[in-house]
């Protein structure tokens, strides 16, 4: 029996649902995921460049500190594994092979990727015996054997060259896309410095996605303190808190920062940049690519048809 399924044609200009955007440390380029592939676009806007064309789902691009490499996850071999490729594209190298989901969150240095996964380490090194609270692992870009970096759940890590590390915690199993969440398990931001852990936020809602400011004495982050997720900045000692964006309809997601202080984030399916002392600017993105969706998908079925 022939089955015809109508599909939607690909958008080319001003596309929506550009996800997991990340500005390069040198501030020149923004990487993002769109329709299951990784793209880059100049930080000033323009035509996007498609880096992956595999039929699998590719997402969560993460920049190396020197802006020369991108790590991302892909299910092209069955489960979500971590891959790395040159910023210009080309064949990616597979770094992980576990049968579970592995998602890159940061580069520890130019040669080491940090990623989260629920691989379940030994009882001596795990925080809670539940796969919903992932551990952090590290793997070399040469695809060496992964090593446990932290049994403590650390999400959206931002790390400085001296090893000082910011992250938001994960105390429970609440969906990260839930909005207006108030409970004892809302996320807070922490600093790990020289083996000591310091809690930096205490709002009874969501504070998450910290990124270091250039000098290392302050940081940017996302908070629902004003009712919806917006970008804030504060000093490490908790002083001089500033709200930098004032979006009201939808939450801000995917905050990253270049070393010159330029911020990049996603809002309402589009990408914005924010320079110090300026107002947020929506990034104009044109995606010029071959159409990958079919108008008709013809399938021949021999069993299983029902009215």
Say what each PLM segment does.
Residues 18, 153, 302-307:
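Signature of short aromatic-glycine-proline-rich micro-motifs recurring in repeat-based ectodomains
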Residues 26-28, 66-68, 110-112, 162-164, ...:
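Short coil/turn segments that connect the beta-strands within blades of beta-propeller domains
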Residues 12-27:
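Short N-terminal segments immediately surrounding and downstream of signal-peptide cleavage
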Residues 7-11:
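Sec/Tat signal peptide C-region and signal peptidase I cleavage site
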Residues 22, 62, 106, 158, ...:
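Conserved beta-strand position repeated across blades of beta-propeller domains
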Residues 1-6:
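Bacterial N-terminal signal peptides
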Residues 40-44:
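Beta-propeller domains
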Residues 13-15, 33-39, 52-58, 71-83, ...:
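A flexible loop/linker signature enriched in serine peptidases of the S9 family
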């Amino acid at each position: 029996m022939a089955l015809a399924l109508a599909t939607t044609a690909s958008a080319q200009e001003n596309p929506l649902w550009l996800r997991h955007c990340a500005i390069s440390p040198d501030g020149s380029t923004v990487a993002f995921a769109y329709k299951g592939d990784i793209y880059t676009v100049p930080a000033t806007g323009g035509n996007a460049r498609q880096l992956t064309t595999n039929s699998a789902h590719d997402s969560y691009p993460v920049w190396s500190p020197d802006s020369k490499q991108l790590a991302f996850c892909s299910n092209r071999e069955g489960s979500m594994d971590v891959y790395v490729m040159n910023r210009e594209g080309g064949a990616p190298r597979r770094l992980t092979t576990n049968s579970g989901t592995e998602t890159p969150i940061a580069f520890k240095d130019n040669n080491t990727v940090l990623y989260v996964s629920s691989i379940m380490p030994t009882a001596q090194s795990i925080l809670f015996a539940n796969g919903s609270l992932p551990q952090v692992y590290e793997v070399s870009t040469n695809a060496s054997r992964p090593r446990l970096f932290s049994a403590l759940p650390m999400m959206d890590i931002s790390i400085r060259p001296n090893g000082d590390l910011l992250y938001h915690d994960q105390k429970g199993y609440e969906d990260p896309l839930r909005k207006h969440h108030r409970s004892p398990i809302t996320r807070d931001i922490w600093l790990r410095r020289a083996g000591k852990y310091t809690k930096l936020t205490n709002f009874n809602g969501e504070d998450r996605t910290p990124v270091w400011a250039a000098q290392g004495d302050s940081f940017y982050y996302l908070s629902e303190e004003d009712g919806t997720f917006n970008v804030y900045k504060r000093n490490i000692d908790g002083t001089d808190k500033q709200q930098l964006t004032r979006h009201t309809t939808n939450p801000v997601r995917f905050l990253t920062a270049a070393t010159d202080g330029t911020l990049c984030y996603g809002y309402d399916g589009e990408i914005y940049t924010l320079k110090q002392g300026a107002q947020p600017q929506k990034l104009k993105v044109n995606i010029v690519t071959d159409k990958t969706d079919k108008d008709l998908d013809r399938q021949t079925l021999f069993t299983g048809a029902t009215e």
